[in-house]
Amino acid sequence: MKHLDYSAPGEREAGERTWEVVRAAFEERLPSPRKRDWRPFALAAAAAVVLAAAFSPPGNAVFGSLRDAVRGERNAKPALASLPAPGRLLAESSAGIWVVQNDGSKRLLTGYRDAAWSPHGLYVAAVHGNELRALEPNGRVHWSLGRTGRLRNPRWSFDGFRVAYFAGRSLRVVNGDGTGDRLLTRDVRPGPVAWQPNAHTLAYVNRAGDIEISNVDKRNRNATVQTRAAPGQLDWASDGKTFIAVEPHAVEVFSQRGPRIGGLDRGIAQMSAAAISPNGKRIAFVETRGGRSTLQLTGVLGGPTGPIFAGAGTFANIGWSPDGRWLLLDWRSADQWLFIHSPVKKVLAVSNIRANFGADSRIAGWCCP
């Protein structure tokens, strides 16, 4: 079946205006513009039932067959030649973790998984077998720590002096030099964890599905924040005053020890990822509805919400560049990474991600100038 590509007259121009309006509202704190209708246009193709999703700037979504065929961005580069902003990437695959330099050169650290950058990108915390290791981006190991149970999701504190990680069904903390390993709690759901900036305070999800805020050095300074559904992701604003929790159908915004102070409920749409911008003002999030995913932008403390990019299939995860001017979107179904620039709309697409990084590769972090 031939795949048809439709766009309504003037639609891309209207999309560009929306991008500028949303961006300006956050950067200049202008009043919210009149809400526009961005629902895709349904068009009939001869001899077949074909849905063509409308352009949502700066990309497009094409539903050209009953199988929701996915076509990525045109003019995509066949490989990642360089990053569009200062910094380095971490990507994970079943073969190990990839360290991608600013010039596009990359190194595979075989056998590692669950990787995270340290502050300033000097080290990587990662799991190798039954060991938690701290290593340089060139693979040189500085320390290792063996533990029973499945190790996962290590995360550095803001100053690099603490590393939190899961071992089996417990949450543990070790000093940044590999000493002083200790149990923090067993009342935890292994998965999301996030350090508050400028503090040794950790946010995690307890067995009941609520969020615990715990100072790992002063154990009597704890708080419990109730949620509507167990979050799958936590992220702090850079000033440490607010954090977000990504629930199955919502993004909730909380003050540093509760309560809820904002957020978005997206109804039946599935929320798959969200990230706060480096300046702490904006939230980029991905929602999926009816086989179509949309990257959207909103304010941490309210303001307009607008689409940035939409496409058929799955957007796996997102990340901000260290300078906050680019968003990296993993368009899993199209086998592409998209670097999306703000405030001037621009998309740089890279194809063949599975061939270059592995069939199950994912973005783990974009760190440090």
Describe these PLM feature segments.
Residues H3-D5, E13-W19, E27-L30, R36-A45, ...:
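Sequence signature of WD/YWTD-type beta-propeller architectures
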Residues V22:
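Hydrophobic "lid"/C-terminal helical patch
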